[in-house]
Amino acid sequence: MKKTVIALVVLMSFAGVSCRHNDAGPSCREFSAVKCNVDALLASQSFVADIFSSRIKERTPVSSLAATLKVRFCIDPSLEGESAEILVKKGKAVIRGARFRAVVAGAGELLRAISYGEKTFCIPDTVLHFAPAKPFRQVYFGRHFDNWYHRAPADKMLRYIDDMALWGMNAVHTILNYPAVDAVHAAESDKEEFAAVSKALAARVRELDMDLTVSGGGNVAPSDMPSEYRATLNTDWRRGGNEWCVCPEIPGALEYLLNVKKGHIGQLSGLPVSGIEFWPYDEGGCGCPLCSPWGGRGYVKLIERYRHLFDEAFPGCLKLVSTWCFDDDDWDLFYEFLRNQDWVDYIVTDSHGEFPEYPLKHPLPEGVKLITFPEISMWGRYPWGSFGAIATPQRFERLFRQAEGISSGCQLYSEGLFEDLNKFVVNGLYKNPSMHADDLLREYARYEFPGCDVDDFVDFVHVLEDTHETYVEGTENDYFVKNYIVKGPAGELDRRRAVCAENLALAEKMERQMLPSVRSGWRWRVLKLRAVIDDQLYSTRQLHNPVLDAAYMELVGIYCAEEQLKGVAKGYGGHTCPPVLPNQ
């Protein structure tokens, strides 16, 4: 039986209907259906046809048969690495990929090259290529604190992972065991649901031929750890708290940590783990004389022991070693460690601000590869995403350029859907460094919001970035939005009042232009709601009114934040929770 999937998209045949296409050229061929041929793929890979056809149908949701774009998917071993080539000619498209993940990424390239209209879609005869410049492109789903990744149902999580694969990302890092920080508030049903989603998530990553990496840990311990094993506290606030960390130099403490780690590894049994990542600080570390500097002494001694446990459980797994919050003392000893080891696949390097100077000034030891850790969620304002989209593409292009010459990829740290645009831009830069942030904004808009003026979209996002940071020096809650609208610089508040009003008008103009099928989608709503909220915050200098409260409640639904809101009402959590309650 042939594995052929047909998605019907209709051309309405009555007079007077104009089919609007975004950036459609004169040679663009018009279609209203797609027929996918997956005969050359394994049966377990045929779902790519459903992914591809569903994305077209969502944008051009019509219902009778007209011209059909025939698309064939196949794996071509003659292609290198994870590259793909897409040939479109005379109503037929062939997507060839070096491996299945490349086929999926190639499908994404074709989807983003199509011009979508209300009744038809079109694409000219063309040749497209997927040949990522940086080999490792991973997204880190922070599944904790009742955020979207923690609480989203399986179908939404799998859909989002599919999107990451269509963008050409090739790895996912996530938390598969229930997060210890949330366990004290969790019912047994919460843990069971989390485990079920974890299993589905891991299976989907494997089906998409992506790598799945998990935390290899550091010296963080369960809350019931023996008090006599407690680590000496960090003195640098950037490194986070380490109240629940163990000093491995205390007699009996190393054996305790190894037993805890064996238990964690046992919980991963049967899951398709292909990599692990060790982490030093935030949370982690010990400031005692035998462990300090932690990043170059206690940390590397500990992960040398851990990595053997993971090798036994997951032979050949990738090993990533983070250098988060390292100082020069950490780096000096860590470089000595790197020169004398043969097992680290990537070091993970970045900071809360600019890219660290040490690896830029000191060449990496021979054979060592570096990936960056763009902090795309938690910069410049708080709570994160609670007021709509976080879009800072220019910042992340600047950071990308700082490390472009030494990096082999990236790991994007994400706390939710609200920085989806940042994910797309940063991943796009690592795929193709010749692109710029504004180029990628236009690509995002053409695909996600067909019909809108892409240059207007670039201008719109520039204002979101320009008004993003809400820092007030010398105040207790220095990055809180609610603090900024009252105590921020008067002149800047007045300026934001004017530009945010104009930006809301621009959002409404774009919304009128874009296809009706995408106006209610969450990607547009988090951007539009940011514009609505900004306009209200700076025009009223108040955190609550009927317009704001309605916007916050819509975001609660988009973020699956209902449980997080309950926690806020009880006095805990709220890192990505819209400020629905009066006391937030």
Task: Give a label for each model feature.
Residues T4-F14:
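Sec-dependent N-terminal signal peptides
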Residues F47, I51, R55, A102-A105, ...:
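Extracytoplasmic/secreted proteins, especially bacterial periplasmic and envelope-associated proteins
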Residues C28-F31, A133-W148, K156, I175:
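Boundary/entry segment of secreted carbohydrate-active catalytic domains
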Residues C36-S44, V94-G97, D146-H150, E188, ...:
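Second-shell loop/turn segments in exported
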Residues S115-T120, H144, N170-V172, D182-C452, ...:
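Catalytic-core regions of glycoside hydrolase
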Residues E404-S407, L417-E419, K431-Q584:
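Catalytic domains of carbohydrate-active enzymes that cleave complex glycans
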Residues C19-R137:
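Contiguous, structured surface segment used for ligand recognition
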Residues D155-Y178:
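Catalytic domains of carbohydrate-active enzymes, especially glycoside hydrolases
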